[in-house]
């Protein structure tokens, strides 16, 4: 386990270390803990949160939504919910889920062979892998096959440097500037208030609520605060995250995945701010088709992989030395490993959210649907007794539309292929993207926004290249110029 994790999780009076199912506690254990029983027990605790109470709540929600869909003439909630999305109908969603499975399965099969070989080093008779083992085995393969240890980059990702780096990158890419307002009111003393400006003129405000505290939401999200209305009010939003808080002795070193999350959520934030100059609140910000909102945020994640971008902020917290280019190259290759399986995992969630809402609620056995779709769409086995749907919050908000994340990942990679990956901080593509994709908000259909920027509807080809990048030649050009 990382030294700073152990420092924050010391044994209590009874000699035991207490670990919660909150994300900052859970994910490092699943990734680094050698004790398989600890990982198994924590995984089962994580996947039974809010059970059985939320099982009944979810069934009630499913029944209400099905009744609404029936009242307005739709066969299912999934069909009703798709009507105002880019997908348009339930049949297109089912087709997309199969399309993703077809793309990811061959890559995932190659990855599973490596993961199983790694597991057999300690368990020679192993023939299968459980879901709770994936993160740990993936980390071991990254070390053995890609010469990369996730902990080797953490010293270069001190929270304060990452925050300033992302602010600087967003300012340069989207032609903005950011100014902190030290005395502005906020809901907690730890929350920072920032103004966004263009050409010296304020265009919006945002709040950074970035560290855990008691009773706080324990995931990461961009939260709209005010809709922007041209000439009446400026848009406001907050980033609510749970990154380790820096202290006098600890600069808040971040995992690679945490930095990616920061980029992702800041992508949502920029989208909200620059699209908040509409005539009507109803089309301001990200008030658009629900299966488009994750595309801009996922695209900004790609800046995290650029050696040029990282050189601007990723410095060792002790020596101040920039992250070595060779380490960045190994990091990117290692980060690409297990994409196939991760996409299949996300696709299984897409299938679960779709399947439970695409039929009559009384016909749905939640645990059975989850186990069936996990086995059908992934190579990992579930643990007996898992009831993860009870704490799968997207079944409430996204309901049948969890496919949105992969739908938008396809769009994001198609968008990113239009940028010069060798120089992401220059050129006019970023401003064309801002004007044609981000700024219109909900004033145009998302399908039109995509066509305006790409010159055509999205396709899956760039996504496939991204998906198989781990097995591509290191010298191959990821993004040939269009």
Per-segment meaning from a language model:
Residues 1-21, 34, 59, 64, ...:
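Active-site-proximal, well-structured secondary-structure segments within enzyme catalytic domains
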Residues 13-15, 23, 36-37, 48-52:
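Substrate/cofactor-recognition hotspot
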Residues 16-18, 161, 165-178, 185-188, ...:
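C-terminal, non-catalytic "cap/extension" segments appended to globular domains
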Residues 23, 46, 243-245:
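Short, histidine-centered active-site or binding-site loop motifs used for metal coordination
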Residues 32-46:
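Short, charge-rich amphipathic alpha-helices with coiled-coil/heptad character
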Residues 42-45, 146-148, 388-391:
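Short, charged/polar, low-complexity loop and linker segments
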Residues 51-64, 441:
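Short, 15-30-residue, compositionally biased linear elements
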Residues 244-263:
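Short pre-active-site segment immediately N-terminal to the catalytic Zn-binding motif
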